[in-house]
């Protein structure tokens, strides 16, 4: 698992960037975007960072299915068949006096998270907590500034103990580790992080990958992290392996189980890689699922 994480952080993130550059720009949404909404009495904001555009070459999606099978899924959904677009976003939770950020995007070299945060009326020094779903570069890259200093200097940075150990031992995030170590607090899967937020273990993607369930009264939202990546492919064919997953069979089983639960419950979710702002529900369709967005960009 730790080996998979090391490979994932370096080569997978590099493939993201290379593929995105190869496909130039997609003008779907502004570079800087902040979409506010509520869960019960809580104020939340979906923050845009960047997006990746990957070729449909079966090197990331459909590893065990092939290009033609992926093409069919994309065509059936009315999407372009030569490329797969993934958003990269973060979630801000305003919980009383606490400003809690879930994940941090790719960082200053390619992301606009800080600009989107400021557009929402919040400066980095106001963030009190940063919750990390897992240690891939498009989720922890924004923990440091271009000069290597902590981006959220007044925040506690929280993640599972297993994920922190994997990041430290991986060798691909040494600058981040050096900068944030004094800020890091770890927890066990399933821990209550704040009165409104609980971690939810979703195994397979990385050693300590976690989702976060946000609750206010009778309303809930699950920030799913990288439990699913494509709003089309990961839902239509959740059994297909994805290159990003460290333990692919376990990640597949976790994905199928989670999507089934979400379709039955109708629970609202935030997915950082689904089309921005990534807020919606999962519905059953045939042998798979479909994405039902609840908010427009």
Model-predicted regions and their roles:
Residues 8-19:
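Bacterial N-terminal signal peptides
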Residues 20-24:
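Sec/Tat signal peptide C-region and signal peptidase I cleavage site
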Residues 25-26, 38, 122, 126, ...:
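Metallo-beta-lactamase
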Residues 26, 217-297:
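Cap/insert and terminal regions of metallo-dependent hydrolase folds
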Residues 30-119, 211-228:
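Conserved beta-strand hairpin/beta-sheet module of binuclear metal-dependent hydrolase folds
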Residues 32, 55, 109, 135-142, ...:
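Active-site environment of divalent metal-dependent phosphoester hydrolases
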Residues 55, 99, 105-182:
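Active-site HxH/HxHxD metal-binding segment of metal-dependent hydrolases
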Residues 102-104, 128-138, 158-160, 202-204, ...:
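Active-site neighborhood of phospho(di)ester-bond hydrolases with catalytic His/Asp-centered motifs
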């Amino acid at each position: 698992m730790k080996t998979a994480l090391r490979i994932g952080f370096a080569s997978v993130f590099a493939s993201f960037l290379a593929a995105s550059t190869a496909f130039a720009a997609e003008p779907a949404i502004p570079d800087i975007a902040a979409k506010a909404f509520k869960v019960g009495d809580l104020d939340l904001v979906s923050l845009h960072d960047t997006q990746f555009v990957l070729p449909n070459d079966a090197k990331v999606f459909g590893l065990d299915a092939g290009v033609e099978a992926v093409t069919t899924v994309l065509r059936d959904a009315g999407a372009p068949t030569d490329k797969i677009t993934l958003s990269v976003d973060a979630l801000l939770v305003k919980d009383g006096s606490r400003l809690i950020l879930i994940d941090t995007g790719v960082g200053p070299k390619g992301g606009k998270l800080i600009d989107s945060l400021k557009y929402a009326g919040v400066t980095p020094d106001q963030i009190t907590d940063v919750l990390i779903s897992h240690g891939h570069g498009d989720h922890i890259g924004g923990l440091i500034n271009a000069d290597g200093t902590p981006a959220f200097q007044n925040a506690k940075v929280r993640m599972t103990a297993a994920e922190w150990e994997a990041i430290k031992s991986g060798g691909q995030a040494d600058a981040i580790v050096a900068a944030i170590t004094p800020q890091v607090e770890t927890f066990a899967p399933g821990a209550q992080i704040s009165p409104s937020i609980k971690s939810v273990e979703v195994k397979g993607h990385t050693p300590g990958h976690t989702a976060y369930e946000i609750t206010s009264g009778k309303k809930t939202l699950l920030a799913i992290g990288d439990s699913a990546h494509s709003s089309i492919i990961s839902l239509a064919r959740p059994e297909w392996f994805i290159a990003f997953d460290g333990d692919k069979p376990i990640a597949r089983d976790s994905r199928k189980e989670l999507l089934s639960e979400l379709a039955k419950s109708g629970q609202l979710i935030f997915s950082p890689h689904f089309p921005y702002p990534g807020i919606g529900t999962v519905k059953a369709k045939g042998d798979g699922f479909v994405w039902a967005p609840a908010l427009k960009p």
